[in-house]
């Protein structure tokens, strides 16, 4: 039987507009948000920074947690984020950087 993984996440803009969502593939979903592939609030307010997330193996628990977060006032959401991520760093900042080949030392040119 395949094990399912679900994530409830909060993403923020530079001005700290906050979007809350739920997905079964957080890496794919963050790629979509970061590249403005998701129409709506997150695209309009440029919410590209993953500032908080929780993982679940049960979809109902994930949906319930997302709904709970959405009912919370802003102060409570900020407190939760800042407890674990006080500077609102992008937790997915390095997920999509391309790897470049960087040799440790230069190879000498071939003699002509």
Language model segments and positions:
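GIY-YIG nuclease catalytic motif and its immediate N-terminal context
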Residues: 1-38, 43-49, 53, 63-67, ...
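Short arginine-rich
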Residues: 68-80
């Amino acid at each position: 039987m395949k094990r399912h993984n679900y994530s409830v996440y909060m993403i923020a803009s530079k001005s700290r507009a906050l979007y809350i969502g739920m997905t079964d593939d957080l890496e794919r979903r963050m790629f979509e948000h970061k590249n403005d592939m998701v129409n709506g609030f997150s695209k309009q307010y440029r919410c590209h920074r993953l500032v908080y997330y929780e993982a679940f193996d049960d979809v109902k628990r994930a949906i319930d947690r997302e709904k709970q977060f959405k009912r919370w006032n802003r102060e409570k959401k900020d407190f939760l984020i800042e407890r674990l991520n006080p500077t609102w760093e992008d937790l997915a900042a390095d997920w999509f950087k391309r790897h470049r080949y960087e040799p440790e030392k230069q190879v000498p040119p071939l003699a002509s």
